[in-house]
Amino acid sequence: HWHLVYPIEAPDRSIVDKDRRGELFYYMHQQIIARYNAERYNAERLSNHMARVQPFNNLDEPIAEGYFPKM
């Protein structure tokens, strides 16, 4: 969605050179992450007999791979 609204190679630079563009980028991604941390998402996971979402606090810790498509 972000790259459709603010295309990198826009023919008219006035489309992508917006004031507060970084703030909008941060807000959009914060909303996406909030969706995964919401109780609604945990309710969906719990109804499918899955564990709650684990918080990701340590940025130095490696992320466990949950899916490997080339198996």
UniProtKB/Swiss-Prot annotation:
Q: Which residues does Cu cation bind? A: 3, 29
Q: What is this protein called?
A: Phenoloxidase 3
Its localization reads: Secreted
What's noted about post-translational modification?
Upon activation, a trypsin type protease cleaves prophenol oxidase to yield the active enzyme.
Annotated gene: PPO3
Q: How is the cofactor bound?
A: Binds 2 copper ions per subunit.
The UniProt entry's sequence similarity note says: Belongs to the tyrosinase family.
Taken from the UniProt entry, a GO cellular component term is:
extracellular region
Cross-referenced SUPFAM superfamilies: Di-copper centre-containing domain
Q: According to its UniProt record, which reaction does this protein catalyse?
A: 2 L-dopa + O2 = 2 L-dopaquinone + 2 H2O; L-tyrosine + O2 = L-dopaquinone + H2O
What InterPro entries does its record include? Di-copper_centre_dom_sf, Hemocyanin/hexamerin, Hemocyanin/hexamerin_mid_dom
Please name every pair of cysteines joined by a disulfide bond in this record: none
**Which species does this protein come from?**
Sarcophaga argyrostoma (Flesh fly)
